[in-house]
Amino acid sequence: EVEIIENPSFLNSKEDLKVYFQDKKHYHQTDFYKQQRISRNILLENGKPVGGKWTFDTENRKKYPKNKKSPSISFPQNNRFYEEAKVYVSENFGNHYGELTDYQIYPTTISEAEIWLENFLENRFLEFGIYEDSIVEQEHFLHHSVLSPLMNIGFLTPNYIIEKSIEFAQKNEIPLNSLEGFIRQILGWREFIRGIYLYKGSFERTRNFWNHQRKIPKSFYDGTTGIAPIDKTIKKILKTGYAHHIERL
C-alpha cells in the first residue's frame, strides 16, 4: 500500500486547493489571494484588509535610483557539501551551461537558510516593496529574498517565512507595501501557480497554442540573441541560476 504524504513546502494540501480550482473554467490570482488571506486571517483587521486594500502592487513599481547602492548580502562560507558538489559537477557536467563559481552563493543547510532569511529581513525587506519590479544590469538580487529555492528543497517552510516576516515587520516598522508585497509572492503567487500545476498542468504541458515548430536557438542558452534585456538576463542566470520575477517576464 502506498501512502501519499502532503508536501510541507506548500501551505495548501491538494484537498485545500480543490475549494478554488476544481470545476472552474477561469482562474484569477487576485481572487485566490483574497480567499487565502481571509481563510488564514493574514493581514486582516475585522475581516478587512489591513491598509484598506488587498494589494499595494501599484506602489511597488519604482525605478531603481541611478546612484543608489544595493543592499549587501551575507553569503555562506564554503562548506564541505559545496566543495563536494563542485568537484562532482565539474567532473560530470563540465560542458553544461552555467558557471561553477569558487564561492558558495546559496545556503546548503537549514541553519544557513535561517541566517539567509534573517539577512533578508534585516537588510532588504524595508525597500523590497517599492523596488521589487526594478531591474539593474549588474545586480542579481537587489532587495529580493531569494527564498524560493530554500522552500523548494524544504529548508524553510512558507508558513515559517510568513510568520517570521510579519513578526519582524511589526517590530521594525516595515512599510505595509513591502510586507504585503512579500506575503503575496508566497501566499498568492506561489500557491496559485501550484494549483494551476496540479489542476491544469497536464493540459498545458501537452498543448502547443502558438504552433511552434522550430527548436530554441543556441543564442537563448548562452545569451547571444542580440536583444540586450534578454541577453543580460540569460547571462545573470548562467552565473547564479537565478532571475527575479520581472527579469523572467
Model-derived segments and spans:
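Catalytic cores of enzymes that engage adenine nucleotides and/or redox cofactors via long glycine-rich
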Residues: 60-245, 249
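Beta-rich, aromatic/charged-enriched effector core domains that present basic-aromatic interfaces
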Residues: 1-105
